[in-house]
Amino acid sequence: MAYRVEILPTAWEDLKKNEDWYMIQFGSETAMNVVDHILSVIERLELYPDSGSLTPDGWLNHYGFRMVICEKHVAIYRQIEDIVYIYHIADTQTEYTKLF
C-alpha cells in the first residue's frame, strides 16, 4: 500500500531556510543536492512510513511522531491513517524537538 506524504507549510519553510543557508555558504549546486536528498528520503515514507525511528523526546513519541535522518538533517513526521504529515525539517545539530 502506498501512503500519501504531505509536507506541511512549516516544513516547507524549514526546507527553504536550509536551502538558502546552503546557497549562501556553498552555492546553488550544493543547495539543490541537499534539498533533493532530503526530499528523496521523505519520499520513501510513501512506501515505508514506519521506517523512521523514535525521536529523542518522550512527548513527541507519545503523540506518534517519528523522525527520519537525512544526513545532517532530520524530518519529523506523524502518520495519520494513510497520510504521512511532515511537520518540520531541521539540522540535526539543533534542538529540533523544541520546534513543537
Segments from the language model and where they lie:
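Hydrophobic packing within well-folded, soluble alpha/beta domains
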Residues: 5-7, 38, 77, 86
